[in-house]
Amino acid sequence: MAFTVSQLSEERFEKIAYKHDRAVNAWEPINVTGLGPLIPVANAEANQLCVYYRFGIFKFTVAKNNTIAAGEAVYYDSVNKVVQDTPPAPGTGFYLGKALSGGTGNPTGTVSVEVSLND
């Protein structure tokens, strides 16, 4: 899987139960109007109740050749399943949060940054 995210800290995590109108994959962020970015903790079919993280600190893979500095705004590219420091094209991603660490993406997708969700 090209996308990696893991819970890094026990600081201020908020979980909510929510039914999304489309199927979701565990740990792949979605953006919900009125709620912002949510991270599902399990795979779920459309309109199935699932638990999501609404706030917290998570680790994401950085887009190839993209540099993210600590403190920068971070955007999720839902097509390539990576994060970057510039907004993706309309309909292909969304604002995720602020970077707590920095890094530059490489061809193997092994560089990651910590992101404070909804920050």
Where do the model's predicted regions map?
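Surface-exposed, low-hydrophobicity beta-strand/loop segments enriched in small/polar/acidic residues
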Residues: 1-119
